[in-house]
Regions:
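Extracytosolic ligand-binding ectodomains
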Residues: 15, 24-394
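Bacterial N-terminal signal peptides that target proteins for export
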Residues: 1-12
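Bacterial N-terminal signal peptides
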Residues: 12-20
Length: 394
C-alpha cells in the first residue's frame, strides 16, 4: 500500500483521538478497526461532516453498549477534501492501518475512484450518499450492468431513482406540463439525474422545453437561465449540490425565471447557505428521510443527534448513521463466523452479511437488491416559509 506524508498522518490521527472513539489502551484483539472516508474540508464539507457525525454517533452508542461481541470499534477517519485522488490516498492509508471495512466515501467522484482498489482488495465498503448508478456496478455503454462490485454497498438511493421520481412528481402531483433542466456536465451525479429525469418525463408526457448546462465549478449561470426564462417552463430541475443551488436560485430570480425549482438529495442543507430562503420558496426536492417522519426509529435518532450536536440531523447524517448500523451488523456476523479478523475469509463474511441485510433503519427498512442498492421510497421536501417541510413519502 502507498504511504503518505507524516503531516497528513498526524492530521488523521488527531481526528481519531478527538472523536473519543479510539481507545489505544485496548489490546489489538479487543478492538475492531473501521475506516471512514469523508470530505471534512473543501467544497462539499457540509455533506462530509454530516455523514461523519452520523457515523460517529452510531459507533459511540455501539461502544457504550459493549461494542461488537465485546470488542470496541476504533474509527479511523480520513479527510479526502472531496478530491478523488486524495480519496485513493486515504483508502491506502486506511488499509495500512488495518481497517476491516470502510464507511465511505460521501460523494460520487471520490467513491468511484476508490472502488477499483477496494474491489481488488475485497474491502467491504458502504457509502451513505454516493448516488451514481455505477458506484456499485460497472456499466456498459448502453447503460446495462456489466459487472456488480460485490464489496460495494450504499444506504442511499441511486441517481436514476431520484431523477425519475422528481419527473413523476412534477407531472402527477404538481400537474406540470413543461419542464426545463439546468445541469452540471462535469458531475456524474448531475448527468445521471438529468438522464433519468428526461426519460421519465418522456414517459409521463412532461414536455422538456429547455436543457441548459454548465461546467463544473461555474458560478455564472445568467445566460442559461435567461434562455430558460424565455421558454417559461412550469418547473426547473437543477440536479446539483447545495452550494451551486444557492447561486442558481439567486441568479434565476434576476433572469426572470418563474418556474418552480426541483432538485434531488444534493439540495439537502441548501437553506444553510442560500442568501435568502425566499429565493427557493415553493421548491421541492427528494431526500432520504425527514425529521418530521413519526416512526420511532426516526424520532429517537433525531432526539439523540440533537442532544449530541445541538442541531437537527439532515439526510446525510441519517444515512451516515444507517450506513454505520448496517456495516456494524455485518461485522458482528463476520466476528461470529470464526474467520480470522482481516483475512479474506473475514472480509467475505462481512460482504455476505451485507448482502443478506434485512433491518429497520432510520431512513426505512433496508434490504439490498442484486446491484447492492437499497430500494426505498423517497421523502419529498417542500421549501416553504423559509423552512424545509416534509411533504410526505412518494
Amino acid at each position: 500500500m502507498k504511504k503518505f506524508a507524516s503531516k497528513a498522518v498526524a492530521v488523521v490521527m488527531a481526528l481519531v483521538m478527538v472523536m473519543g472513539l479510539a481507545s489505544f489502551a485496548f489490546a489489538a484483539s479487543d478492538t475492531i478497526k473501521v475506516g471512514v472516508l469523508a470530505p471534512l474540508t473543501g467544497a462539499v464539507a457540509q455533506y462530509g461532516n454530516a455523514v461523519n457525525n452520523g457515523v460517529m454517533m452510531y459507533f459511540e452508542e455501539l461502544n457504550a453498549n459493549g461494542g461488537i461481541n465485546g470488542k470496541q470499534v476504533e474509527l479511523i477517519v480520513y479527510d479526502e477534501e472531496g478530491d478523488p485522488v486524495k480519496a485513493v490516498t486515504g483508502y491506502n492509508y486506511l488499509m495500512d492501518q488495518g481497517v476491516v471495512a470502510i464507511v465511505g466515501d460521501v460523494t460520487t467522484g471520490p467513491t468511484k475512484a476508490v472502488v477499483a482498489e477496494s474491489q481488488a482488495d475485497l474491502t467491504p465498503m458502504i457509502t451513505a450518499s454516493a448516488t451514481a448508478e455505477d458506484v456499485t456496478c460497472q456499466l456498459n455503454e448502453d447503460g446495462s450492468v456489466a459487472m456488480v462490485y460485490e464489496n460495494m454497498f450504499r444506504s442511499c438511493f441511486i441517481d436514476p431513482f431520484q431523477g425519475s421520481k422528481m419527473a413523476a412528481f412534477a407531472k402527477e402531483q404538481m400537474g406540470a406540463g413543461t419542464a426545463a433542466i439546468l445541469y452540471n456536465t462535469g458531475s456524474d451525479y448531475s448527468v445521471g439525474l438529468t438522464k433519468a429525469f428526461e426519460a421519465t418525463a418522456a414517459e409521463q408526457g412532461l414536455e422538456v422545453v429547455a436543457v441548459e448546462s454548465y461546467a463544473d465549478g461555474a458560478v455564472d449561470f445568467q445566460s442559461q437561465l435567461t434562455n430558460i426564462a424565455a421558454k417559461a417552463p412550469d418547473v426547473l430541475f437543477v440536479p446539483d449540490y447545495y452550494s451551486v443551488i444557492a447561486l442558481v436560485a439567486q441568479q434565476a430570480q434576476s433572469a426572470g425565471v418563474k418556474a418552480t425549482m426541483l432538485g434531488a438529495d444534493g439540495w439537502d442543507s441548501v437553506l444553510g447557505v442560500v442568501t435568502d430562503a425566499a429565493l427557493l420558496e415553493g421548491a421541492y426536492y427528494c431526500s432520504g428521510y425527514s425529521t418530521e417522519d413519526t416512526r420511532e426509529e426516526v424520532q429517537t435518532f433525531v432526539a439523540n443527534f440533537k442532544a449530541r450536536y445541538d442541531t437537527d440531523p439532515d439526510m446525510f447524517a441519517a444515512q451516515g448513521y444507517d450506513a454505520a448500523m448496517i456495516m456494524a451488523a455485518a461485522i458482528e456476523k463476520a466476528e461470529a463466523s470464526g474467520a480470522k479478523a482481516g483475512s479474506d475469509e473475514y472480509r467475505q463474511a462481512i460482504i455476505d452479511a451485507l448482502k443478506a441485510t434485512d433491518m429497520d433503519c432510520v431512513t426505512g427498512h433496508v434490504t439490498f437488491n442484486e446491484y447492492n442498492n437499497p430500494e426505498k421510497t423517497a421523502a419529498i421536501i417542500n421549501i416553504t416559509g423559509g423552512a424545509a417541510k416534509y411533504w410526505g413519502n412518494y
